[in-house]
Structures are given as structure tokens and as C-alpha cells.
Amino acid sequence: MEALVYTFLLVSTLGIIFFAIFFREPPKLPTKKN
């Protein structure tokens, strides 16, 4: 049961870091809406 908790915390932390870096830097996608 503890393994599931640690796995969930690890995935959530990586997701938060990923979105933080993605929204901090300008998206390098070919979308010129703004």
C-alpha cells in the first residue's frame, strides 16, 4: 500500500514540475494564436 502512495507522489511531483516548466517557458508549438 505504501508503494502506491510513493508512486502517486512521484508521478504527481513530476507532473507538477513538467507543467511548471512548460507554462514558464514559451511553448515551442507552431500555434500563433497569441
UniProtKB/Swiss-Prot annotation:
Family: Belongs to the PsbT family.
Membrane topology: Single-pass membrane protein
Domain of life: Eukaryota
Source taxonomy: Eukaryota, Viridiplantae, Streptophyta, Embryophyta, Tracheophyta
Ranges that cross the membrane: 3-23
Keyword rRNA processing: no
Subcellular location: Plastid, Chloroplast thylakoid membrane
The protein's name in its UniProt record: Photosystem II reaction center protein T
Purpose of the protein: Found at the monomer-monomer interface of the photosystem II (PS II) dimer, plays a role in assembly and dimerization of PSII. PSII is a light-driven water plastoquinone oxidoreductase, using light energy to abstract electrons from H(2)O, generating a proton gradient subsequently used for ATP formation.
UniProt entry keywords in alphabetical sequence: Chloroplast, Membrane, Photosynthesis, Photosystem II, Plastid, Thylakoid, Transmembrane, Transmembrane helix
Protein source organism: Atropa belladonna
Pfam family, one: PsbT
Assembly: PSII is composed of 1 copy each of membrane proteins PsbA, PsbB, PsbC, PsbD, PsbE, PsbF, PsbH, PsbI, PsbJ, PsbK, PsbL, PsbM, PsbT, PsbY, PsbZ, Psb30/Ycf12, at least 3 peripheral proteins of the oxygen-evolving complex and a large number of cofactors. It forms dimeric complexes.
Matching InterPro entries: PSII_PsbT, PSII_PsbT_sf
GO cellular component: chloroplast thylakoid membrane; photosystem II reaction center
Keyword Ion transport: no
GO term, biological process aspect, one: photosynthesis
